[in-house]
From Swiss-Prot:
Native source organism of the sequence: Homo sapiens (Human)
Region Disordered, annotated ranges: 391-641
Name of this protein: Brevican core protein
Region spans: O-glycosylated at one site: 569-575
Segments for region (O-glycosylated at two sites): 520-530, 540-545
Recorded family membership: Belongs to the aggrecan/versican proteoglycan family.
Keyword Phosphoprotein: yes
Amino acid sequence: MAQLFLPLLAALVLAQAPAALADVLEGDSSEDRAFRVRIAGDAPLQGVLGGALTIPCHVHYLRPPPSRRAVLGSPRVKWTFLSRGREAEVLVARGVRVKVNEAYRFRVALPAYPASLTDVSLALSELRPNDSGIYRCEVQHGIDDSSDAVEVKVKGVVFLYREGSARYAFSFSGAQEACARIGAHIATPEQLYAAYLGGYEQCDAGWLSDQTVRYPIQTPREACYGDMDGFPGVRNYGVVDPDDLYDVYCYAEDLNGELFLGDPPEKLTLEEARAYCQERGAEIATTGQLYAAWDGGLDHCSPGWLADGSVRYPIVTPSQRCGGGLPGVKTLFLFPNQTGFPNKHSRFNVYCFRDSAQPSAIPEASNPASNPASDGLEAIVTVTETLEELQLPQEATESESRGAIYSIPIMEDGGGGSSTPEDPAEAPRTLLEFETQSMVPPTGFSEEEGKALEEEEKYEDEEEKEEEEEEEEVEDEALWAWPSELSSPGPEASLPTEPAAQEESLSQAPARAVLQPGASPLPDGESEASRPPRVHGPPTETLPTPRERNLASPSPSTLVEAREVGEATGGPELSGVPRGESEETGSSEGAPSLLPATRAPEGTRELEAPSEDNSGRTAPAGTSVQAQPVLPTDSASRGGVAVVPASGDCVPSPCHNGGTCLEEEEGVRCLCLPGYGGDLCDVGLRFCNPGWDAFQGACYKHFSTRRSWEEAETQCRMYGAHLASISTPEEQDFINNRYREYQWIGLNDRTIEGDFLWSDGVPLLYENWNPGQPDSYFLSGENCVVMVWHDQGQWSDVPCNYHLSYTCKMGLVSCGPPPELPLAQVFGRPRLRYEVDTVLRYRCREGLAQRNLPLIRCQENGRWEAPQISCVPRRPARALHPEEDPEGRQGRLLGRWKALLIPPSSPMPGP
């Protein structure tokens, strides 16, 4: 028994020996230590932006303190600042000698030292956002030393605010009311200056509390010189007439409650969002509350409604798919001039706010790499992580290369351009850098460029679900995603929104059509490889009977058929032409392969070239040649398929003006672009305006006047055009050989760094980069593309503020305003002209129910499809129970409405 007990006792003694030894050592250490340093107060210590804060640090001597003799006998005091794993000295003092870091000059002091050797508290004034971090107080006296540390959090955020309707819309009194309405206060000059010192930059003039108008600029440039020319600083217009109109700088600080993201399975309209929050004992959050929550650590990669009708989302930990390179509150604007909030019927998540007696904790920053859907959790937790300002390299001069960028008036959207702050005006922020205004990203806070989003307003008739086959919603609402005033450049393409392309099954009325090559756009998230090519049988023509077709809603601002240049092995190439642009046969080295064929609309002739022709070449197989429905009497004006004598193959192509050669048993067919006709597509049916050059279904006009990229795009849009987009090698050669100059083209990556898009929304189907291009690295400012004519027209990315010549391009065929209906209206803002294949959607007026297809398409003949929509009164619920309506008044009333409202050509809806 003793043999078992002794080992157990020894084990217990050994187990407790380390703890006892530690107590002894600690006691010895405490006895040997001459003093101890302690920072009083609960962590984190909180200060306010632009204010002052004293960090209390005291020395507690465990032995009698030394007598005050000479300076050499004084303790050495050192304050350091730790942030992001880096440590920087704030000041070092010994007696009356004090050394202060240049970054803290005139802002820090030891108010009690050396008069008191036990009080080494640090006074910090003019607090900035990047003053948040860990401060360590270290005291050394002789061979003894001790230290303590505390976290400091600077509260408060300054942000620019504007109404969604217009830019520069506030008088001084209106500016004060606007900030109060969104749960904030109008900022003071001291707060704006502190934000500027923290890296904030905004090239927009805004009201401050002292009735002055100012704006902060880190990197001076032409559009943002103000009263300081080429020097950085806060531009000041001085005291301004209170009736003048500007934006306003607001300040948000405390969040006295819980702010959480509402993420229901079904996205919400604005009214539904308000009801959603009320059902949970909360109210829809204000813009100021969201900024305060973001400043406290709220991070959600999901746009949500706010009380003022804006849609925003906060990013603390940015990533390439959520917020780009810098943190901030991102905002979705409707127009590229940063105005217009999303339509109230659009569907998003919602940010709710639940009031409480004490300031609430902020939801823990979510991981942006996670699924945004997981952000719907309403758990509120305390964030212990400190929000730090992102510092950019001071020596970086690429920021200046962004230069002055002016607002682009979007004539078709009714949006007007804006002038520079001196007028006053604005320069774009970074992306998301503002597409119409260039803004150099400041160290920490910067505006991101606008990113174009395509989203259709989704409307669904509840009664229609019960009585008719349910129609899926088509997304067709053009939203420009522009970040908010504190956003940062460079978000990834996958901005957190609903997929921009969703398939919808739509009924199509019979119509004659002429064949067009192409492939329908793929839904978002589906790769080409996942859809094998379809091989069609012998040439057949679809009978003109009603049938269902699949219509996808792609992300460009207008619905266009996505087509790509393809090359068959050893055979001819089919070159698709988006929006009526050029196409021509021939091979293109390195061009993408033809998209797999998809189901064609009614009126489509499905053709397949023979697998081998007489010359042994293999023709493309499984090519779906899609026809677009038109009125029978208009088929000639939109081009067509003509049969010419068989020549063995289509090389060289006998077709002119970009016509596509198709081989059939009965001969060779020429598929003509819109605006051309004849057997060989050699007859012009439409012509460009005087001064414009026609080429393969498009019109071009070159301007030798040198402008920045934004100014050039603005000028093109004034003509209803865009900077030239290039879809084929033939179009590249035409532009480069005809207009032999360095010139802008419409390609740019200002929306998302590295994701190049055409300004007219045409898919990027062809590239002609110079070797080593594009070479723009993050935040370098090389976001626009130039064609170098003497180098075979190869492309290079350069800063957008270069002044170069440019070429504008518009479709040869376009549609005017859509037909007006007495009981329905079109979604979106009207435009001067609509490209071919643009799809618009009608909606019935309030109180009426929709019947039949609500979509119309701009046809290749420049005419809109005849509207099929019918609007009828909603059926009262009790009409379903005849016994409750013995006199049949509901039925008679419904019959009179039908007779009055339904067009004679429209089919009568079933009961």
